[in-house]
Every structure is written in C-alpha cells, then in structure tokens.
Amino acid sequence: PRLETIIMEATYGGKDDNPPARRESEEELIKIIKETIEKKGKVLIPVLGVGRAQEIMLIVEKFVRNKQLPEIPVYVQGMVWDVTAIHTAYPDFFHSNVKKAIFNKDQNPFMNSVFKHVGSQKEMQEVIEGGPCVVLATSGMMTGGASVEYFKALSDSDRNAVVLVSYQGPGSLGRRLENGDKDIRISETETIKVKLNVFKLSGFSGHSSRDQLMEFVKMLEPRPKKIILIHGESSKCLELASAIHKQFRIETIAPRTLDTIRIR
C-alpha cells in the first residue's frame, strides 16, 4: 500500500486540548441541572440541531429513567423537535442499547413524557415565565435562533444557568460567555449584563482530542509524506502541525483559506 498525503482535522489541535471523559461530562451536566433546579432556576443548553441535541436528550432521559434526576420538564425548541422526529422514524440506525429499548421494551427515549415541544413565541414566553426546567434550543454557538432569545430572558438571574456542550467559534456569543464576559453587546442598542451561571462541558465533542490525533498519526503505516491540517482555528492547526513534524518528521501544512497546495 502507498500513502502519500493525509488531510486531517485540528479542531482540538492545541497542546492542552484533551477533553474529559464522556462519563465525567454526563455526570457534571446532571449535577448542574440538579443544583439549578433546586434553586428554582432554569438550565439553557444551546445545542446543534442534528446530533448533539439528541445526545443530550438521551442522557437526560437515562438519568430520569434511573431516578437519578427528578422528572422536570425539558423543553425542546422547534427545529430540534422536528429533527428528533426524523431520528425517531429510523430506529434501525440507533446505537444498539437504544434499539433494544425500543424494540424489546417498547421504550423510545425520545418520546419520554419529560420532553415538551415549544413551537411558538407564545409557548416560549410561557417557558420563560414558568417554573424550573431545562431548555434545549439552537443555535449551539448562540449566533442566532431561540437559544439567544432564551439567554436574553434568563441572563439577569444567578439562579439560572447556561451549559455550553458544543464547540464555540471565535466571535460567537457562546465564545464570549465561555471567556467570562459579563457585559454582552447584542446589538447597537442592547447590552446584556450576565448574571446567570455559565458552564462549559467539553466531553460531548464529536471531534478527536489532541492525544487521539497524535496517536492516529503514530499508527499510520506506511507513514505519509505530507499531512495537511484543516478544520481548526489557525493557532490549533499550526500547533498540531508543529507537534507532528517535531515528533514524526513528516512534512506538515496548515493552509490558510484559499491557499493552493500541490499534492504531488
């Protein structure tokens, strides 16, 4: 076999980019939800509509079913609900544990009674004015959509919490919250003072950690002549490119947008 060039991601290419184990993040999420609910607050979880939202729903449902989390309402905003309905229509593609629950026990986790659909502005306002709950809404980086509207409504109370479970891109509202900003400018005329609690959980990422990326390169046989790093912030691509070159003596490239590269 011949291996000439590898194109690989560098989302978590920084030297300290090794997220905690998935189980740790699951337990931390449930802990945050419990503590916030006990304070009579609300938990906003901005999610990616496809994939991440359904993962969080499965986690919450599991802990509710096992009596490790009280049966508080989990409000699922518009698009997330629609995408989840498509997931539910194709159970054959689920993880084996979920398939067994559906086919052997007639328990579809996505149809648990804790999940409530929010489909209108009026219903959203009722959620905001109502009691303790969890809210799943897009967009995951809080660049727009219902997650921003919920944030604006919930940000003025330290009883509430926002839990960031996705990557937050530079310049996004989510990244500013992640960085600890307490005065968030939403528009020319609107600035939000952040009083709610902000949590970042990295263990839900669908991307490989720095160690996993380095291990992948180590296992390549034969060694490629060239590795091109993409899908990451410029600093992450450069850091990973440098580390790979230093450890494996492979030519690495961290191209900028619109750069042209000759493969051979």
Model-derived features: positions:
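Acidic/His-rich, metal-assisted hydrolase cores and their charged scaffolds
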Residues: 1-264
